């Protein structure tokens, strides 16, 4: 098949692309590298860096002209409903729908469907500390109404919606186009497993990115309390907004990753960390695991509560001799559930039913 993947979140489309290529398919990735993360892509969505009239051309005119010429793909998959600027997004997507065989939406971010499920009380707590995201979909504002309108039109255009986790499946539960959850893909050939040895102090790391959504306030509070009470046993690193290569360097020296505490499920950062043999503290609920046919995971579940996180940090300190084996179990879990070759096959099966 000839496949176009449009947009990127934390290497999700990169790893899916690599799995699909391993299956013998022709895949092209269009993205701007997920912003400051600078992730690889075959072609940019739009050029950045210029100002004035040139910026208007780069941001609006050129991509509209170029993507109208993207034709003849068997599958065009969007990583979110709004990949381009709001002024041209739906114009481009209508052209992609017209000029290619099938148009698919990957549900991998907190779009209007997820916000609606939260407002209706179906999803709990995920935006309790991230009210800024809710404002983007405020129906009392013109900007919010236009954003909702544009997303709804994209949903009308796509042939299939593929959720990557429980909350996105719940968000689209009333949409007949939604498929079963397909787990996140990881290219294990590119993510090296290294024994998680504790050399001196246990190193704990929390990466700063979308702090309100991830619950950084609670994670930071617990980590600082741990450092205060166990100064000779632990090192804590709280840093962020790093290019992916720099982020991976920090991961290399870390024993335990604290990712997020205000969700139902773990994401790409947690998956990559587990694949590298790290102990991961994150969200991992029974509902989310059930959606990917798993009864348990090696993820240590945490919630938006400083005391809860702190107690689990102390438990790890008291089990430092088990950290290496815990990291090994993390890797084995990713090999079983998230191998990009297995995930690529699941996407091919979903697309094949169109």
Residue ranges of model-derived segments:
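A charged, aromatic-enriched C-terminal amphipathic alpha-helix characteristic of glycosyltransferases
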Residues: 320-352
